[in-house]
């Protein structure tokens, strides 16, 4: 029986490249002259910590990150911006989490969406992915279109298509 997996993955190298490009742009921008701005990527915890001078600079860096992530073909919906907190050195700090893997709630929403479509396919949750199996390849392609059109606010990839 044909099947495929719905996953949410991030290319770690592209994330690293995007963060480095943002740092290069910050070095060349006039409005960041004389302002200490730090961006640290922690690959183990999948977080980016951002420390800069004021609220306007945080917004500018956020816009730069979204632009560079889009340029590097990493979906900006995989960025989860935390709240802005003041630091002891009169600067502002923001934690950005990289969403990777499908959590249980989102997986349940996907399965519910697929079952509500009345297509003759089965969806099963496997750790941080959803496996969809069906008799017809056309039904599987309909499921891909259905999930792509849904507003689940998360980037999905469709892998392991088996016939």
Curated annotation (Swiss-Prot):
Keywords: Nucleotide-binding
Gene Ontology molecular function: nucleotide binding
Highest taxon above the source species: Bacteria
Entry GO terms, CC: cytosol
InterPro entries xref list: DUF520 (IPR007551), UPF0234-like_C (IPR035571), UPF0234_N (IPR035570), YajQ-like_sf (IPR036183)
The protein's role, per its UniProt record: Nucleotide-binding protein.
HAMAP family to which the protein is assigned, alphabetical: YajQ
UniProt record similarity statement: Belongs to the YajQ family.
Name the record gives this protein: Nucleotide-binding protein Desal_2385
Organism: Maridesulfovibrio salexigens (strain ATCC 14822 / DSM 2638 / NCIMB 8403 / VKM B-1763) (Desulfovibrio salexigens)
